[in-house]
Design a protein with these regions (language model features):
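Extended, composition-driven regions rather than compact fold-specific motifs
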Residues: 2-264
Length: 264
């Protein structure tokens, strides 16, 4: 293997495994951000040792049942065992920030109708409790790829916000399925990134990426030293992933495609 190939291998995203832990946490603070997100700070001694080094890491958030009871599982050699075999409602969320000295974890909840997490966040008050599982692992992505491309809707904005706080690339392109006013208020300073606002991902037809792909056809992609990140609705993410890997011949190791939700 040449030195160049070794260097490229070292720059590929690296997976890190974590010991699976479940934690009970309590709401410490809650504020409304950009009119569409609740930023909730959780605290608790159980957060000691929490790790989430990847910008789009996720924890499994478990919600209380209709009676208010919060269930935590037992981790055994045979796997995860839930009390009475009942698994509570759960959703994946990105850790936005973690203060290890104070054991305070911050996550942003996108507000939308009919969502168990959104409904809980809307009602949440200081002292309310949740259970968290994971992260099971992290994908650590170099911050200084020369070219970086990010496509997401509102659900991906917390991970993107975290990424933009540390990214060092000179050539960053953002294609965002969100209202420009909300996106600008939420993300704040995006430095020199070039952003294309595509309208809210909640709008009818927003999950069809045909028009976006036509736009992307005009974008020149480098052959090396790049990273592409795609998130949002499952079918749209798959079509975009197929486009970049198949039609645009990008290396699948440098294309991160993750479905954050699925249209029903």
């Amino acid at each position: 293997m040449s030195n160049s190939e070794k260097n490229n291998l070292r720059r590929l995203p690296q997976r890190i495994r974590h010991e699976l832990r479940f934690r009970q946490v309590a709401v410490a603070e809650k504020i409304l951000v950009a009119q569409r997100f609740y930023r909730i700070v959780f605290s608790g001694d159980a957060l000691a040792g929490f790790l989430a080094p990847g910008f789009d890491d996720h924890v499994k958030v478990f919600f209380p049942d209709a009676t208010g009871e919060l269930r935590l599982p037992t981790v055994t050699e045979q796997g995860i065992v839930w009390q009475d075999g009942v698994r509570p409602a759960a959703r994946d969320y990105t850790p936005l920030d973690f203060d290890a000295e104070r054991n305070r974890l911050t996550m942003d909840f996108y507000i939308h109708p009919g969502g168990v997490a959104s409904d809980w966040a809307s009602r949440a008050q200081p002292g309310d409790k949740l259970a968290l599982g994971g992260p099971r692992g992290s994908l650590v992505v170099a911050e200084d790829y020369a070219f970086q491309l990010y496509v997401c809707d509102e659900t991906g904005l917390p991970a993107l916000k975290r990424r933009l706080q540390t990214v060092q690339a000179a050539d960053i392109h953002l294609y965002l399925l969100t209202d420009a006013e909300i996106g600008q208020a939420y993300l704040g300073d995006i430095g020199g990134a070039q952003v294309t606002w595509l309208g809210s991902g909640d709008l009818p037809g927003a999950q069809d990426p045909t028009a976006l792909i036509t736009t992307l056809d005009t974008l020149t992609l480098p052959d090396e030293d790049y990273f592409i990140w795609l998130t949002g609705e499952g079918q749209r993410v798959k079509r975009l992933s197929d486009y970049f890997i198949g039609q645009r011949r990008r290396d699948d190791a440098s294309v991160r495609a993750v479905a954050y939700w699925h249209q029903k």
